[in-house]
Every structure is written in structure tokens, then in C-alpha cells.
């Protein structure tokens, strides 16, 4: 193992990278509440892993979506556990996100020069809520169907462009297969990609600027 490590060390300077990561100064006022953001990130990773596992069995069609979820829960080995973990970690992510934003706001972490860190955090909050809205519809049961119908109907109140936005979200005039396909694509590809990008930006800015001082 030593020779393998030395081979990589000679080419990538792994030790220098590790030293830079572990030697970052942590202010003495930092407490457990400053770790809440890390819990949000951990919940996101659990979401990605458990969601990826379910894509092997889930079928995003109005005829088979509900039965495929039933199959995951009853026939797939540990499928019930994987889906439950996905649901529990989703709730944990939302709860910890709210607490994290409260902590940042109450400790003034949004002030100069960290305004952009706050902005990326707000964008991540919007993406998290979008995860909830799109994921809620995927079982395509009565609750999911009517939730989608109500949510996608909200923009209709916007003058001039409201109807066009509704059709864009639904993939047509009414809720159906095109709507489910759109929500599935958003939930499994678009939103995870955007979340990963903005999380990286968020972390890099925190790394660059450090943790905000006490009030």
C-alpha cells in the first residue's frame, strides 16, 4: 500500500491537499449549530443514493407508476427500507435546511462579504422545495395527482402568460403522461444537477471566506 500511495503522492501531491483541507482555521465561537448545514448535505447524499436505487424499478408512466412503487415496497429486497429512508431523509433535509437558514440569519452570516453565499443558499432552498413538489407526484396516486394539478394550476392567475406557464409545466392543457414525464425528469436529473452545482459554489465560497464571526 505504501508504494501505491507514494505513486499517487508523487503525481498528485495528495498530502498537500489533505493538509490544506484539515488545517483550515475554525473560530472558537463555532458550536454544534454550525454543523446543521453539513446534515443538509448528508441528507442530500442519502437522497441521491436511495433515489438512484429506486430508479432501477420505478416506471414513470401513468399506467405503471403506482404499481411500480407497490412493487418496490412489497417485492424488492429491502425496497421498503430504501423508499422509507428516501422519505425520511427528505423530511430531515427540509427540517435541517430551515434550521440552517435560521442559524445563518440570526448570526449575521448573510452580511458583507458573504452576500453571494446567502444567495446560493436561498437558491438551494428553492431547489429543495422543488424536489418535494416533483417527488410527491411520482407515485401517481390520488394525493400525488391532485397535488400536481393544484401546484401546476397556480401560475394560471398570472396575467397574460399564466396559461402558457401552466401548459409548459403540464406538457399540455391537462395533467397526464407529459406532466409525469416532466416531473420525473426534473426530480431525477435537472434538480440534482442544479443542486450539486450550487452546493459546490456554496462550499467554495465558505471555504474562501471562512465562517462568519460572532455577533
Curated annotation (Swiss-Prot):
The keyword Zinc does not apply. It holds the Pfam family Cytochrome_B. It is a multi-pass membrane protein. Keywords: Chloroplast, Electron transport, Heme, Iron, Membrane, Metal-binding, Photosynthesis, Plastid, Thylakoid, Transmembrane, Transmembrane helix, Transport. Its cofactor is heme b; heme c. Its main location: plastid. Heme b 1 binds at residues 100, 202. GO terms for molecular function: electron transporter, transferring electrons within cytochrome b6/f complex of photosystem II activity; metal ion binding; oxidoreductase activity. It is found in: Plastid, Chloroplast thylakoid membrane. HAMAP family: Cytb6_f_cytb6 (MF_00633). Belongs to the cytochrome b family. PetB subfamily. The 4 large subunits of the cytochrome b6-f complex are cytochrome b6, subunit IV (17 kDa polypeptide, PetD), cytochrome f and the Rieske protein, while the 4 small subunits are PetG, PetL, PetM and PetN. The complex functions as a dimer. NCBIfam families: PRK03735.1 (NF002990). Heme 1 (or BH or b566) is high-potential and absorbs at about 566 nm, and heme 2 (or BL or b562) is low-potential and absorbs at about 562 nm. Component of the cytochrome b6-f complex, which mediates electron transfer between photosystem II (PSII) and photosystem I (PSI), cyclic electron flow around PSI, and state transitions. This is Cytochrome b6. It comes from Gracilaria tenuistipitata var. liui. The lineage of its organism: Eukaryota, Rhodophyta, Florideophyceae, Rhodymeniophycidae, Gracilariales.
